Amino acid sequence: LMKKKIAVLGSTGSIGKTTIDIIKKDKHNFEVILLTSNNNYQKLYKQAKELNVKNLIINNKKQYLNLKKKVKNKKINIFNNFNNFNKIFKKKIDYTMCAI
């Protein structure tokens, strides 16, 4: 069975965190393709590590720079704004949870 590919927009807020908790309980059925946050780069980084997410968007420029410093894995794509959705959504995503 193929894993369902998911994007979680606003993953560091309360709805986003609840969504992530549900996904973690059923990891064999889901693959998170994208996580986004407005400001909370530390929580975004933690979620990306836990779920092996390769695409992150953080809207705040200062927090983007902090996240870039923190992420040592060059295989993780980090974007500073939502203009990069087109690049990411060329990948197949089955579900998008919009918690923003």
Task: For the regions a language model picked out, list residue spans one by one.
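Conserved N-terminal catalytic core of the sugar/cofactor nucleotidyltransferase
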Residues: 43-80
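N-terminal Rossmann-like dinucleotide-binding module
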Residues: 2-54
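Structural motif
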Residues: 9, 35, 59, 79, ...
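Conserved active-site and cofactor/substrate-binding residues in soluble primary-metabolism enzymes
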Residues: 10, 14, 39, 62, ...
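Alpha-helical scaffold segments in soluble metabolic enzymes
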Residues: 18-21, 47, 66, 87, ...
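Generic N-terminal leader/processing signal
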Residues: 1-3, 72-73
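A structured beta-alpha segment of the ubiquitous adenosine-cofactor-binding alpha/beta core
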Residues: 68-100
